[in-house]
Amino acid sequence: MINSDISEQLALMQLSDSFFPTGSFTFSHGLETLVQTGKIQSQPEILYFLQILLRNKVGVSDVVALIHSYRGCKNGDIEAVRVADRMLFVQTAIAKNRETQRQSGRALLMVASSTWQDERLKTLNIDAVSGNIHCLHPVIFGAVTSVVGLDERNAVLAFLHGLVTNILGAAIRLGILGHIQAQQILLQLVPDIEAVWSTAVSMNLEQMWSCTPFIDIAQMQHPKLAHKLFAN
């Protein structure tokens, strides 16, 4: 018999690992623009960038939609997953962000459906093909983590860990951060990640918001860069 606690922890590690093929490692969330324009060049600046992104955008929009998708899927209410998907799509103002969220969400759903056999994932696949859902990555992540048996908090932590490590990986590839510095930042972000969880867990979908104009402008300017390593 498989120990359920061990199974959950292994699923958490599997889903938060960059080895899991969703293409999220190709996203810089505006960091590439800010580096190329000289606005971010140091460890403290990257830390601040991540803190603002977590507290003023991801934590009060993406994570909220993730949690409601998780709860809906856990209760067998796929319509709740669809609602979370629609609400987050409206909340995501930048077209390129919507596109990349859909791409990684569809990739996640495809890989998860091939790895874990579950009727709820099959239904979401049908929805994706028929256009009933946008398939945004945070929403699909919430549904998948519910299916594989993670508890709600661990689902959020897995998502945030994956997001942060992908951005830190982008900073390393852009040449402005070393591996040891990245680990230091990851540790420094623990209070911010805890705060995101504490805030998002009690929010409803109508309360989602974001206020990161500096990052939003950088993301909108990204397509104009002469040379790009990342998709956004």
UniProtKB/Swiss-Prot annotation:
What superkingdom does the record give? Answer: Bacteria
Tell me, in one coarse class, where this protein mainly resides: cytoplasm
InterPro entries with a match to the protein in the record = UreF (IPR002639), UreF_sf (IPR038277)
Q: Name one GO cellular component term.
A: cytoplasm
Which UniProt key words apply to this protein?
Chaperone, Cytoplasm, Nickel insertion
UniProt-recorded Gene Ontology molecular function terms: nickel cation binding
Cell compartment(s), UniProt: Cytoplasm
Q: Which family does it belong to?
A: Belongs to the UreF family.
Task performed by this protein = Required for maturation of urease via the functional incorporation of the urease nickel metallocenter.
Q: How does it assemble?
A: UreD, UreF and UreG form a complex that acts as a GTP-hydrolysis-dependent molecular chaperone, activating the urease apoprotein by helping to assemble the nickel containing metallocenter of UreC. The UreE protein probably delivers the nickel.
HAMAP family for the chain: UreF
The protein here is known as: Urease accessory protein UreF
Organism equals Trichodesmium erythraeum (strain IMS101)
